[in-house]
Amino acid sequence: MSVSVLSPSRLLGDVSGILQAASLLILLLLLIKAVQLYLHRQWLLKALQQFPCPPSHWLFGHIQELQQDQELQRIQKWVETFPSACPHWLWGGKVRVQLYDPDYMKVILGRSDPKSHGSYRFLAPWIGYGLLLLNGQTWFQHRRMLTPAFHYDILKPYVGLMADSVRVMLDKWEELLGQDSPLEVFQHVSLMTLDTIMKCAFSHQGSIQVDRNSQSYIQAISDLNNLVFSRVRNAFHQNDTIYSLTSAGRWTHRACQLAHQHTDQVIQLRKAQLQKEGELEKIKRKRHLDFLDILLLAKMENGSILSDKDLRAEVDTFMFEGHDTTASGISWILYALATHPKHQERCREEIHSLLGDGASITWNHLDQMPYTTMCIKEALRLYPPVPGIGRELSTPVTFPDGRSLPKGIMVLLSIYGLHHNPKVWPNPEVFDPFRFAPGSAQHSHAFLPFSGGSRNCIGKQFAMNELKVATALTLLRFELLPDPTRIPIPIARLVLKSKNGIHLRLRRLPNPCEDKDQL
């Protein structure tokens, strides 16, 4: 029996043929993909012909214009040039339509469109599918289940805990005054708001502001903020597998692990405590139920409890949303008051007449500082903690001016653009608290620091209380002055940050009690 042996030349010929066939197949697939992208872009151009926008690159869209932390400045220019809405082209023929008109906002927020899957999904490895990312009936069930955690009776005792956390931060600032240099406040405020969340929502004993281990969690959250935002804008990081192989993907994985270790520890400690305390009625007689108690003890409509996965997702979501957005709000409020000393002093006079030296602040005080509240709202208008929120249209929509968008379009409700829209807010860059004076006329959707509609921020009242407590106690202790050498540059991340930090000079104010003692 003879055995045929392939010659090297024949073997090379076979390999060459396979490679040629593979190359042709790849070229064909690329051609098909290119045609699909072209046809999709043509469809989008036709669908958006009623919405003019600046010239864009055929492949990279407006990405290059918005890459160098200039997005907010660009949005302000587009708001002035293009009425109500403006398409923002991304790489590869993708587009999102920026909305910054209150009538447009009202239409979208009155619908039940899901969060945009394209960009929000990048948050899932970090915060899971909790209240922020869920859609449809599951979201509705979770929202209804969590609403009791934000009832007034639950929130009232939190005011004292908030004040305790703020005082720890202010004491630290007093110690740093001797260094005679401006203070970067965001990091301090972020640690304070995390401390507040831990005390109020998770009944943590002590203060994590003096616990160095908490710094790693704060850093992980800061890193994830930047990493997720950068990934959304990077055409090569959209695929999960490819992203996991990059340095940014590995960094994201490590940061997620740190964040999850923190929340897992919080959950396990509470589970052990609940087992010791016994039945629900016995627990209620001992103490108030907090956010974590309600999560662990609540049941879904079908009688089942939350799975460990769902539980961690809700805790991670609230941990992030409850401290990072509030930290942004407080930091920018303090900066706004530092740059407007007359308004700062008027707030201080109001707070001093109400609280004296601030030794005690309660729930009832929070509705008795109208001018301070006006200043807080005006700062939130200028510096909204969440610059924008996305929706993917589940059905076509027609706006009040007759223009329409088809199903499947991604819209970005630009809260920053809305708050800086000169047609909505005359002289939008001017700090004017009297925009929010009692009786002032406003469109119902002109001011949306906590979003709006059925998916508005569930912790809105909690956050507003914390903003008031932090502002009041800080103004009683310090005079705030800006650092003229480092003016903050707002940049859009998951929350509104400053590219170069928020640096303030602090001047210790005399304590009225100390003055009396000297007399």
Swiss-Prot record:
Coiled coil: none
Regulation of catalytic or functional activity: Activated by cytochrome b5.
Topology within the bilayer: Peripheral membrane protein
Locations listed in the record: Endoplasmic reticulum membrane; Microsome membrane
GO biological process: arachidonate metabolic process; epoxygenase P450 pathway; fatty acid metabolic process; icosanoid biosynthetic process; kidney development; lauric acid metabolic process; leukotriene metabolic process; linoleic acid metabolic process
Binding site for heme: E321, C457
Source domain of life: Eukaryota
Gene Ontology CC terms: apical plasma membrane; cytoplasm; endoplasmic reticulum membrane; intracellular membrane-bounded organelle
UniProtKB keywords: Endoplasmic reticulum, Fatty acid metabolism, Heme, Iron, Lipid metabolism, Membrane, Metal-binding, Microsome, Monooxygenase, NADP, Oxidoreductase, Phosphoprotein
Residues recorded with modification Phosphoserine: S440
InterPro entries recorded: Cyt_P450, Cyt_P450_CS, Cyt_P450_E_grp-I, Cyt_P450_sf, Cytochrome_P450_Monoox
Catalytic function, reaction form: an organic molecule + reduced [NADPH--hemoprotein reductase] + O2 = an alcohol + oxidized [NADPH--hemoprotein reductase] + H2O + H(+); an omega-methyl-long-chain fatty acid + reduced [NADPH--hemoprotein reductase] + O2 = an omega-hydroxy-long-chain fatty acid + oxidized [NADPH--hemoprotein reductase] + H2O + H(+); dodecanoate + reduced [NADPH--hemoprotein reductase] + O2 = 12-hydroxydodecanoate + oxidized [NADPH--hemoprotein reductase] + H2O + H(+); tetradecanoate + reduced [NADPH--hemoprotein reductase] + O2 = 14-hydroxytetradecanoate + oxidized [NADPH--hemoprotein reductase] + H2O + H(+)
Broad class of where this protein is predominantly found: endoplasmic reticulum
EC main group: oxidoreductase
Propeptide: 1-4
Pfam families associated with the record: p450
Pathway this chain belongs to: Lipid metabolism; arachidonate metabolism; Lipid metabolism; oxylipin biosynthesis
Required cofactor(s): heme
E.C. code: 1.14.14.1, 1.14.14.80
GO molecular function: alkane 1-monooxygenase activity; arachidonate epoxygenase activity; arachidonate monooxygenase activity; arachidonate omega-hydroxylase activity; heme binding; iron ion binding; leukotriene-B4 20-monooxygenase activity; long-chain fatty acid omega-hydroxylase activity
Expression sites by tissue: Expressed in liver. Expressed in S2 and S3 segments of proximal tubules in cortex and outer medulla of kidney.
Family, per entry: Belongs to the cytochrome P450 family.
Job of this protein: A cytochrome P450 monooxygenase involved in the metabolism of fatty acids and their oxygenated derivatives (oxylipins). Mechanistically, uses molecular oxygen inserting one oxygen atom into a substrate, and reducing the second into a water molecule, with two electrons provided by NADPH via cytochrome P450 reductase (CPR; NADPH-ferrihemoprotein reductase).
Protein name stated in the entry: Cytochrome P450 4A11
